[in-house]
Amino acid sequence: LNFKALAALAKKIL
């Protein structure tokens, strides 16, 4: 998992 994927996930959750 890369940073962009993590950022997208965080944005979806938050």
Curated annotation (Swiss-Prot):
Record family assignment: Belongs to the MCD family. Mastoparan subfamily.
GO cellular component: extracellular region; membrane; other organism cell membrane
Coiled coil: none
Major localization class: secreted
The keyword Protein transport is assigned to this record: no
Residues that bear Leucine amide: L14
Source domain of life: Eukaryota
Name under which the protein is recorded: Polistes-mastoparan-R2
Gene Ontology molecular function terms on file: toxin activity
Matches recorded under InterPro entries: Mastoparan (IPR013213)
Cited function: Mast cell degranulating peptide with high potency of histamine release (EC(50)=0.26 uM on rat mast cells). and high hemolytic activity (23% sheep erythrocytes lysis at 50 mM). Its mast cell degranulation activity may be related to the activation of G-protein coupled receptors in mast cells as well as interaction with other proteins located in cell endosomal membranes in the mast cells.
Subcellular location: Secreted; Target cell membrane
GO biological process terms on file: killing of cells of another organism
UniProt keyword list: Amidation, Cytolysis, G-protein coupled receptor impairing toxin, Mast cell degranulation, Membrane, Secreted, Target cell membrane, Target membrane, Toxin
